[in-house]
Amino acid sequence: MSSVNQPKFIIFSQHGLSDTNSEMLSLAHKVAPPNSHIVAPNLGIVKTYFNIEPLVDKVEKYAVQAFEQYPNIPIRIIATSLGGVIWVEVLSRNREWWSEIESLVLLGSPIGGSDLARMIDPFGWGIGMAKYLGENRRPLAEKITAVISTLVVTGNTTGGSDGTVTIESTKLKHAHFVCVNGVSHPTLKSAPAVARAIQVFWEKPRKPLPAPNITIVSGLIGYFRTVQGITDANSADVQYAKIVHSFADGTTMRTWINGFGVYHVFIVNADRRCQYAGFVGWVHIAGLETAIEKAKKIF
C-alpha cells in the first residue's frame, strides 16, 4: 500500500460489560490524532455477560486484520472496564506485538479483580462474566506495563471507587495513573477530563515508570496481594477499621469485618492515608489472619 494512504496510527478502542461500541468509538474520534485508523469492535451487549474467551478471540481477530492491512504502523489502545481485561488477555497471548504498541490506556479496568464480581461469584463457580472479572490479572498486566507505556485512568465518586470498580483494583506497577474526582464508571467514556488525560499522555513519548522504591508500605502491598483469595477493596471503608499493628515508620495495619462477615485488611501510611485495601471471603479468612500475623514479624 502506498505510504500516502497509510494512517499515522492504529487506534483500538474497546468497550466493556453491558455496552456497545458507540461511546468508545466517539471517544476514539475525540482523542485520535489526524489520519488515524480507528478500530472499535462491537462485542454485543448480551455476549458480554457470559464467557470472556469468545470476546478475547474476536478482539484478537480484529487486531490481526488491522496489522495485516497496515503493517508497521504505531498502535495505541484505549479500553474501558471489561475491555481492558480483554486487552490484557490479548496482549498476554501475543507478546510479539508489544514492540509495535506505542501505548495502552485503561479506563476503570479491574485488573486486580472486581470486588462486585467476587460478591456475585465468591467461590469462583463460574457465574457468568463474574467468574472472569473476579480474577486477579495483575501479574499478567504488570509484565505488559513494564514494557508498554501505560496510562490508568480511574474515576472517584465514593472516596475509594467510581461506584462500580475500586480504585485499588485498577492500579498497576509501571503505569502512569490519573484519578478523576466526580467521574463515575459509566461516564469515564464521555467525561472531558478523561479525554484530556489521554491527549496529554499522548502529547509526548512516555516510558514505563520504574518499580516503586522498596518501603514498608510497598512491601506490605506486594505481600498482601499474594494472599490466596484476596481481592482489592474500597479504600473508603478504612474509616471502619481498627489498628491491629503499628510499624516503626508509622505505617499501620488495620482490619474490619463488614456486616456480611467479609474480612478486610488496610495499609495506612504515616500520613494516615490508606495505601491498600483488600478483602477475602469466608473460606479464606484463616489464611488472611495467618498472613497478618506473619506480616507483624516480617516487616
Where are these regions (language model features)?
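Serine-dependent carboxylesterase/thioesterase catalytic core
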Residues: 11-15, 22, 31, 37-153, ...
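Post-His helix in hydrolase/transferase enzymes
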Residues: 54, 189-203
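Active-site-adjacent alpha-helix of alpha/beta-hydrolase-fold enzymes
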Residues: 159-186
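A short, charged/proline- and glycine-enriched loop
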Residues: 4-10
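Catalytic histidine-centered segment of alpha/beta-hydrolase-like enzymes
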Residues: 49-50, 184-192, 264
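Extended non-globular C-terminal regions
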Residues: 212-299
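Short, charged low-complexity linker/loop segments at the C-terminal edge of domains
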Residues: 203-212
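Typically the conserved alpha-helix immediately C-terminal to a functionally engaged Cys/Sec
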Residues: 27-28
